[in-house]
Amino acid sequence: MKTGKIIKVSGPLVVAEGMDEANIYDVCKVGEKGLIGEIIEMRGDKASIQVYEETSGIGPGDPVVTTGEPLSVELGPGLIESMFDGIQRPLDAFMEAAKSSFLTRGVSVPSLNREKKWDFKPTAKVGDDVKSGTVIGTVQETPVVEQRIMIPIGIEGKIKEIKAGSFTVTETIAIVETEKGDREVQLMQKWPVRKGRPYSAKINPVEPMLTGQRVIDTFFPVAKGGAAAIPGPFGAGKTVTQHQIAKWGDAEIVVYVGCGERGNEMTDVVNEFPELIDPKTGESLMKRTVLIANTSNMPVAAREASIYTGITIAEYFRDMGYSVSIMADSTSRWAEALREMSGRLEEMPGDEGYPAYLGSRLADYYERAGKVECLGNDGRIGSITAIGAVSPPGGDISEPVSQSTLRIVKVFWGLDAQLAYQRHFPTINWLTSYSLYADTIDKWMNGNVAENWGALRLEAMTILQDEAQLQEIVRLVGIDALSEKDRLKLDVAKSIREDYLQQNGFHEIDTYTSLKKQYKMLNLILGYRKEAERALEAGVYLNDILAMEDLKDRIARSKYIHEDDLEKMDQIVVDLKNAIDNLINKGGVANA
């Protein structure tokens, strides 16, 4: 370990000399308190160090010691249900060590609990050939998550010894005989955060990640292994949308990174998730969640590390064969941290002061998402779905972070302040949003949900787009200028908007909608259009059709029908057909 000397302090940036033996991205202990920092630039024997803790009180002449290791995370049992800061210090152990409710400088705590014992059940036996990524046993970490203990990257050989029983994360569970001698394997392994974990092959994502949010699953789906962005102005509901996806998304593991956002938003997650029950497992949602809290009142530099820490933990669970979703809230704050460090390093600024390499850094992050065939000999398939919130100042998505993100991701959920003011949630604007996975996922839906799913989705989307054009005419010359067919189209579009797209995240039934129910709801609304058009062709007045208040009310309330009572929707379809038949036969208002 080489000791250097500080010659300059500029906020979170410290420059030290005498560091000629250090490497870029090495972790350093800065000052007498041993603050954690990372070398981000080397010039001769001078190192520029990004410090992840408050640097007040540090000055020229103070020592800097390099550890010779890059910033790494500890991967093993104990990750699930934990809450870490941006450099993977567990906040509960941090509080005990610091004896304070506030983040204290210079406190060093291990990321994974060194005392807790975990029950290890071997699945491999002595004499088995193993290589990087081979699963040699399991640990039941929570009732929902089984950790598959893998051979660390870079080890290949024969198992010489393997033990069953209770072990801490640092105790040896197996010995592998390699060409370079015996290698010990523990429950825990380390991995540098800036380097993506390797895999056998990348696979094209075709299966949707279901979220239970109708506007997402039906119109703008994201594939398992895809990448999505949620840009929107303040108060448009980015965080609530991410919370909903984290709660109800059908990923097996959720990594939630609160990066530079308000502390009370992380508090909401910590308070809500343990009480919410996962509809698939019947267990608390917290039993499959890893939280990384790096809120706006924590040091700016640590924001950059928090995103990498999160994606590395996600890759570890992906390598086990799980489907993982990672929420980053918000990547704009992370980009602001990059901008601050770039300014302190006196680099040439790009657009709006952001560094010229902003686009490539964002791409590095999103490209670590994807569906892959994992290392090992059993052909496991794992995926990471990355969902990043973007907070453009004033909601202007022409700024660099939004534009760089949109060039990379394939799904854009554009949040609209106008919809938020109208109390329409989720505030995803159906005219500006898009999903490049929609055609691929339609094929999956047609095969797994209903043959005409894609056709229904297209019909509903066309109606919503036509509505926007018809609204222009109505604003200019009034609704009376429209034909009856167009007025009916406006009525159906209103039903799609208010009864289908709008969803109450706080209602116990409406907060989550299965694919089967989504199909039945959409089929019901578009079935109403089909029947109403049949009546118009038979000469029934539009006002008589619109006067069927009771039936329209039942269609609107179908979103509150329980998942176990979906046959009630089939009854509404029958009643609707009968009511239209009555109208055609009588030529008057149906007594529905």
From Swiss-Prot:
Keyword terms of this UniProt record: ATP synthesis, ATP-binding, Hydrogen ion transport, Ion transport, Nucleotide-binding, Translocase, Transport
Which sites bind ATP?
Answer: G232, P233, F234, G235, A236, G237, K238, T239
This entry's Enzyme Commission designation comes to: 7.1.2.2
Query: One MF term in GO for this entry?
Result: proton-transporting ATPase activity, rotational mechanism
Give GO cellular component annotations, separated by semicolons: proton-transporting ATP synthase complex
Instruction: Tell me which InterPro entries the record gives.
Output: ATP-synt_VA_C (IPR055190), ATP-synth_a_Xtn (IPR031686), ATP_synth_asu-like_sf (IPR023366), ATPase_F1/V1/A1_a/bsu_N (IPR004100), ATPase_F1/V1/A1_a/bsu_N_sf (IPR036121), ATPase_F1/V1/A1_a/bsu_nucl-bd (IPR000194), ATPase_F1/V1_b/a_C (IPR024034), P-loop_NTPase (IPR027417)
List the NCBIfam families hit by this protein, alphabetically.
PRK04192.1
Q: Please name the Pfam families in this protein's record.
A: ATP-synt_ab, ATP-synt_ab_N, ATP-synt_ab_Xtn, ATP-synt_VA_C
The protein's name: V-type ATP synthase alpha chain
Gene3D superfamilies linked: 2.40.30.20, 2.40.50.100, Bovine Mitochondrial F1-atpase, Atp Synthase Beta Chain, Chain D, domain 3 (1.10.1140.10), P-loop containing nucleotide triphosphate hydrolases (3.40.50.300)
Functional note: Produces ATP from ADP in the presence of a proton gradient across the membrane. The V-type alpha chain is a catalytic subunit.
Originating organism: Clostridium botulinum (strain Eklund 17B / Type B)
Q: Which family does it belong to?
A: Belongs to the ATPase alpha/beta chains family.
Q: SUPFAM superfamilies under this entry?
A: C-terminal domain of alpha and beta subunits of F1 ATP synthase, N-terminal domain of alpha and beta subunits of F1 ATP synthase, P-loop containing nucleoside triphosphate hydrolases
What catalytic activity does the UniProt entry give for this protein?
ATP + H2O + 4 H(+)(in) = ADP + phosphate + 5 H(+)(out)
Q: Does the keyword Transport apply?
A: yes
Any single biological process term in GO: proton motive force-driven plasma membrane ATP synthesis
